[in-house]
């Protein structure tokens, strides 16, 4: 593996918009990630952008593969998700995965959807976005060459103004 590149992106002024953050896995290895500090400034929500590092997958899937449909073992993918979930202080049973297909469907999810797309099948065919107002859930979306839209508000839905 090559040497890690430290990345720090700032906008005009001094506010950092994307930072690196490492978590320690149960086995002592590191789970490197990126995050948007602006989304965490009030301490209510947490965000994480995974890299390909810090997981258990091998070969062409090395190391933090998060998809099962391409030949990696389900056990490896589940362990990799366990590492992501642990960074959020939870486990894969509280993760909800989406399946993007370049449409415009946004699904509202809640506790009843926990584990969907990972520990149990999805109840919908696709969702290009997921949203929740329930704490303790990890919403997971997958991107390769698309820009992921991320938004957050601490207001309740009926208090939000457009």
Language model segments and positions:
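A short aromatic-anchored loop/beta-hairpin motif
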Residues: 4-120
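Short acidic-glycine loop/turn motifs at beta-strand connectors
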Residues: 134-135, 155
């Amino acid at each position: 593996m090559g040497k890690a590149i430290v990345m720090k992106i700032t906008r005009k002024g001094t506010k950092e918009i994307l930072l690196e953050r490492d978590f320690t896995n149960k086995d002592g290895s590191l789970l490197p990630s990126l995050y948007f500090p602006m989304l965490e400034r009030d301490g209510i929500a947490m965000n994480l952008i995974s890299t390909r590092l810090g997981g258990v997958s091998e070969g062409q899937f090395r190391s933090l593969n998060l998809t099962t449909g391409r030949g990696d073992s389900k056990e490896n993918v589940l362990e990799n998700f366990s590492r992501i979930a642990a960074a959020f202080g939870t486990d894969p049973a509280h993760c909800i995965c989406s399946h993007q297909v370049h449409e415009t469907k946004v699904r509202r999810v809640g506790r009843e959807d926990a584990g969907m797309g990972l520990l149990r099948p999805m109840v919908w065919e696709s969702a290009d976005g997921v949203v929740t107002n329930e704490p303790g859930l990890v919403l997971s979306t997958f991107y390769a060459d698309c820009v992921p839209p991320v938004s957050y508000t601490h207001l309740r839905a009926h208090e939000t103004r457009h």
